[in-house]
Amino acid sequence: MINQENNDLYDLNEALKVENLTLNDYEEICKRLKRKPNRTELGMFGVMWSEHCCYRNSKPLLSKFPTEGKHVLVGPGENAGVIDVGNNQKLVFKIESHNHPSAIEPFQGAATGVGGILRDIFTMGARPIAVLNSLRFGNLDKSSNVDLLRGVVSGIAHYGNCVGVPTVGGEIDFDDSYSGNPLVNVMALGLLETEEIVCSGAKNVGSPVLYVGNTTGRDGVGGASFASSELTTTSLDDRPAVQVGDPFIEKSLIEACLDAFKTGDVIAAQDMGAAGLTCSSAEMAANGKLGISIDLDLVPSREDDMSSYQYLLSESQERMLFVVKEEKINDLIEKFSKWGLYASVVGEVIGTNEVIISHKGKIVAKIPTSALSDDTPVNFHNVINNPPDDLLKKWEWKENDLPEIHEKNIFSLKENKNFSFSEIILKLLSNPSIASKRWIYKQYDSQVQSNTVFTPGKSDAAVIRLREQNKKNKSKVFSGVAASVDCNSRWVALDPFRGSIAAVAESARNVSCVGAEPVAITNNLNFSSPENEIGYWQLSSSCNGIAEACKALETPVTGGNVSLYNESKNKDNLITPINPTPVIGMVGKLDNVEKAISSEWKNIEDQIWLIGSHKSETKIAASSYLEYFHGEITGRPPKIDLLDEKFCQSFLRNAILKSLVVSSHDISDGGLAIALAESCILSERGATIELEKDLNRVDNLLFAEGGSRIIFTISKMKQNEWFNYLQLNQIKFPSSVYVKKIGYVSSDTLKIKIDEKNICNIRVEELTEKFNNSISDYF
């Protein structure tokens, strides 16, 4: 008999609103249970049937992704993906979002986002070795956005620094669409330390279920449902739905869990993240095709008089649920106690496929595991056949809509005056989306663990040194991994399909630019409401683009996160959706980390080369230049030829491994001119560049984006070897791929000539001042 705890008298309409469920959902719940749910059970269904937990709106689209590959050991379905990076080493990685919590409580929202993704990693038996983040905020001319940025960065820094995991890289972008709804996506990587991957499926009927970690409180109750709804002017009232983290307990939890896993006494493990004890128990039961019974009276709590609803939906941080060997339970409890952690047997594995919850001596919930985890509802939406009319109109934009170029100047449609190309370069460098993120990453400890090869900002991707390998020559050789998070949300907003292909291609290109082979991705799909036909079309088109790019580049998807309903409602009830933002977290492997290279020029007189594709379009449409200089967000983003993209990356990687290429940098936001300026700034050296205009406008040549392009340098000492390599590989080149010398590294000035005419002459000091101070000036 199910105890209704006197809450069978609840107001149904009010309860459904709180749990973000529909009347149809309620009728389906009654059908599954063959009775009416009590209030506790309704809360359990509310969180488990939310988009955050069951992907009810996105599941049909996620099935399009390739999930298998030669390096993939664990794909979607577990706490994180796992790949083989060679030398008997396994990399665990995943990305997650904490968007809505960060919007109303930026410090704790971001901090617990870091804590949550770290638990996904070490729950698999891996030691966390790196964190990256992808952040989006509204423009910094609004003080509220400055406050959000300050709070989020402080939260990430606090948790990551205290727990001892380096924050090694990331990206950040600013756009008005994020003003009411910032995005905080965190990616973590870990190196497996156990002989076997620790999985989440419960096994062996009668095995004890062990609760480990922090105590349970009322913080975070309903967090999963909160994360699956839009933000409104009353969202600040939902602050109790934001969790409060303790990185020092997390540090103890990491060490204690890895120690316990190595004993082989832990049969299964699941962290308590979204939906807390409800989700962890249901997923462990479902993944093991068994059931679990939990007695809430045995759960360590920090507050008195908590209801079963609060116990089950609390998202208090730093908590884990284990299935363990019965004969080893005392040893494990003693081990966790030594780390200052609570450890208590709270239940057992049962033979029936149910989650059974007891409280105060009575059963308060009894639900089939399939109803909570395996067989959750799916919302099917119609996909509109054609892009929206406003996008089609933007796609008609042509470069000849811009003012003509007179000598060395062009008229800005945004500021109604002429600018020289040197002034435009400086202006673009001061755009916060392009400018140095030094103010942000200097708050992070990027060097803890002593395996970070390049500090943030020095290279296109983060590079982490792995364990030493024993080679026959007895010299120390370290393998490594590279990671990058990328998305040009402006491109995705203007064409979700092309923009998402570009996000995958750029993340792979960044990994290739350090010399690593891209092998797999995790993604974080940040979109607005799927109930809006344009919002769902954006999501569907984006998934199609990601799937196509991942198949072509052979980088399967190992898992990730979907965050929908990212839109804000103002006091007039007007809804502002975010730019669709499918963040791609790419990982790559290096056999020898000493071969990795950065983006900075190395030596004066090194040759500067450019590789790219004629099939991959290069144009001003959808560019940063068009937005920031002319005030227009329009045009169709460049199309990327994925075969040429793959060839360009492979060709460059091979040259890097042969130690022919000494620096490389992909061309993205701001085009060729900004890529050149960035390498000058990083190295405190100049560059002398000579280009041919052909039929291009000068601004197209300097600021166009796309083209699968990379600039790289060849040491003046290796030029003969380079030309030999180039000649040997020429026969393999597709006719649409080009490699050409465009200049050389010089002392202290960026000089650009086009058709032998001086277009730009800027001292590196001036470039650096604009680049470094743009964001910090707001603080």
Swiss-Prot record:
This is Phosphoribosylformylglycinamidine synthase subunit PurL. Part of the phosphoribosylformylglycinamidine synthase complex involved in the purines biosynthetic pathway. Catalyzes the ATP-dependent conversion of formylglycinamide ribonucleotide (FGAR) and glutamine to yield formylglycinamidine ribonucleotide (FGAM) and glutamate. The FGAM synthase complex is composed of three subunits. PurQ produces an ammonia molecule by converting glutamine to glutamate. PurL transfers the ammonia molecule to FGAR to form FGAM in an ATP-dependent manner. InterPro entries: PRibForGlyAmidine_synth_PurL, PurL_linker, PurM-like_C_dom, PurM-like_C_sf, PurM-like_N, PurM-like_N_sf. The active site is at residues 52, 98. Substrate binds at residues 97-100, 119, 243, 315-317, 563. Its EC number is 6.3.5.3. It is found in: Cytoplasm. ATP binds at residues 55, 94, 523, 560. NCBIfam families: FGAM_synth_II, PRK01213.1. PANTHER family: PHOSPHORIBOSYLFORMYLGLYCINAMIDINE SYNTHASE SUBUNIT PURL. Mg(2+) 1 binds at residues 96, 561. Monomer. Part of the FGAM synthase complex composed of 1 PurL, 1 PurQ and 2 PurS subunits. Keywords: ATP-binding, Cytoplasm, Ligase, Magnesium, Metal-binding, Nucleotide-binding, Purine biosynthesis. Its main location: cytoplasm. GO terms for molecular function: ATP binding; magnesium ion binding; phosphoribosylformylglycinamidine synthase activity. GO terms for biological process: 'de novo' IMP biosynthetic process. Pathway: Purine metabolism; IMP biosynthesis via de novo pathway; 5-amino-1-(5-phospho-D-ribosyl)imidazole from N(2)-formyl-N(1)-(5-phospho-D-ribosyl)glycinamide: step 1/2. One of its GO terms (cellular component) is cytoplasm. Belongs to the FGAMS family. Mg(2+) 2 binds at residues 120, 271. It catalyses: N(2)-formyl-N(1)-(5-phospho-beta-D-ribosyl)glycinamide + L-glutamine + ATP + H2O = 2-formamido-N(1)-(5-O-phospho-beta-D-ribosyl)acetamidine + L-glutamate + ADP + phosphate + H(+).
